[in-house]
Every structure is written in C-alpha cells, then in structure tokens.
Swiss-Prot record:
Family: Belongs to the NPY family.
Cited Pfam families: Hormone_3
Marked site (Cleavage) residue numbers: 2-3
Gene3D superfamilies: 6.10.250.900
Protein name as annotated: Peptide YY
Highest taxon above the source species: Eukaryota
A Gene Ontology BP annotation from the UniProt entry: neuropeptide signaling pathway
Organism expressing this protein natively: Oryctolagus cuniculus
Classification via CDD domains: PAH
Keywords per UniProt: Amidation, Hormone, Phosphoprotein, Secreted
Modified sites of kind Tyrosine amide: 36
One GO CC term, this protein: extracellular space
The protein's role, per its UniProt record: This gut peptide inhibits exocrine pancreatic secretion, has a vasoconstrictory action and inhibitis jejunal and colonic mobility.
Amino acid sequence: YPSKPEAPGEDASPEELNRYYASLRHYLNLVTRQRY
C-alpha cells in the first residue's frame, strides 16, 4: 500500500509544494483505484 507523501514545511519552496501536490494527487489516484 502506498505511503502518504510527507507534507513540506512552512518554509517550503514553490517547487517543493508543486512536487508534493503532484505526488499527493498520484497517491490519491492509487488509493482510490485500489478501492473500487
């Protein structure tokens, strides 16, 4: 089962935030695909 991506800190750069949201979206896709 995929692990949830770690949230970047308060001082994260925009690149880190974009990478986090992209990985989070990928993680949610994996989780919901396995559920149905």
